[in-house]
Amino acid sequence: MKARVLAKTWLTHLAVERGLSANTLSNYRRDVERYCDWLEAAGLDDIRDITTAHVESYVKDLRRGIDGQQALSASSAGRALIVARGLHKFALMEGEVAADVAADVSPPAMGRHLPDTLSINEVALLIDAIPHSDIATPVDLRDRALVELLYGTGARISEAIGLAVDDVSEMPEVLRITGKGSKQRIVPFGSMAQQAVREYLVRARPALSKGKSHALFLNQRGGPLSRQSAWAVLKKTVERAGLDKDISPHTLRHSFATHLLEGGADVRVVQELLGHSSVTTTQIYTHITADSLREVWRGAHPRA
């Protein structure tokens, strides 16, 4: 069977049988199409003709850059390999091949990359840069509610914009957030985030709403706020705050986790709040706090 035909069947399987989110499916589709393009350029149309050496060459080409395209980082090439592995595993499961040629291909070596975070003062500067008094516009109040919720709950941007009005209408002390793979988790809904969301619901959302969407966060046309628009909100807020940092919505999630650990929270509690399936993913934040402690020690200890 042609690899591209099998890839389409596999994506359908992921959508129907695995229930992957639209965003995750979009990422898988992009990566598997890139893999199929590479295979066809190498004269490997049939899934049965591919060997382990071919998969290894694909990963190396990703790191070098394919056909003048920008080279991928080790982590991005590793994710692309995961998709290629998934396709070959599916080929074996469907009886199209006798062996999984990608199973033993190693991902590119990665150095430890610590996520960017904000200090507690920088978070305060970011939030306070958004007007919230009587001069605040409906968009200002929406933006403040979004940023407060992202930092206050550690939600991913896709999770935050996926919230409905009914999820927060009674201002519960905890929020039920739907994450990757439609998995739900419970996170505390703190007083500052509640206050910002309440003010948005009372003073701003009715002005934005055209009565056609149940989404919590709306754009100026009354539709659900998109991921791209949410990124733009944060970029505008960073400029207002005068912060000379490259800050994304995920930076607030990283900061949420780091500040919890610095405050003494158990790493497994933080794992649950973030919705990580493995504590190993969460433990990267313990490296951040350890690095911070070392910097304080170097500056303060007489024997440093």
UniProtKB/Swiss-Prot annotation:
> What SUPFAM superfamilies does the record point to?
DNA breaking-rejoining enzymes
As for subcellular location, the record says: Cytoplasm
State any GO CC term. Answer: cytoplasm
Residue span(s) of domain Tyr recombinase: 113-298
Q: Which InterPro entries does this entry report, sorted A to Z?
A: CB, DNA_brk_join_enz, Integrase-like_cat_sf, Integrase_catalytic, Integrase_recombinase_N, Integrase_SAM-like_N, Recomb_XerD, Tyrosine_recombinase_XerC/XerD
**Domain named Core-binding (CB): which ranges?**
1-92
> What's one Pfam family the UniProt record gives for this protein?
Phage_int_SAM_1
A GO molecular function annotation here is: tyrosine-based site-specific recombinase activity
The record's keywords, sorted A to Z, are: Cell cycle, Cell division, Chromosome partition, Cytoplasm, DNA integration, DNA recombination, DNA-binding
What GO biological process term is on the record, naming one? cell division
Show the active-site residues. Answer: 156, 180, 250, 253, 276, 285
Q: What does this protein do?
A: Site-specific tyrosine recombinase, which acts by catalyzing the cutting and rejoining of the recombining DNA molecules. The XerC-XerD complex is essential to convert dimers of the bacterial chromosome into monomers to permit their segregation at cell division. It also contributes to the segregational stability of plasmids.
User: What is the protein's quaternary organization?
Assistant: Forms a cyclic heterotetrameric complex composed of two molecules of XerC and two molecules of XerD.
Output this protein's name.
Answer: Tyrosine recombinase XerD
Q: What organism is listed for this UniProt entry?
A: Corynebacterium glutamicum (strain ATCC 13032 / DSM 20300 / JCM 1318 / BCRC 11384 / CCUG 27702 / LMG 3730 / NBRC 12168 / NCIMB 10025 / NRRL B-2784 / 534)
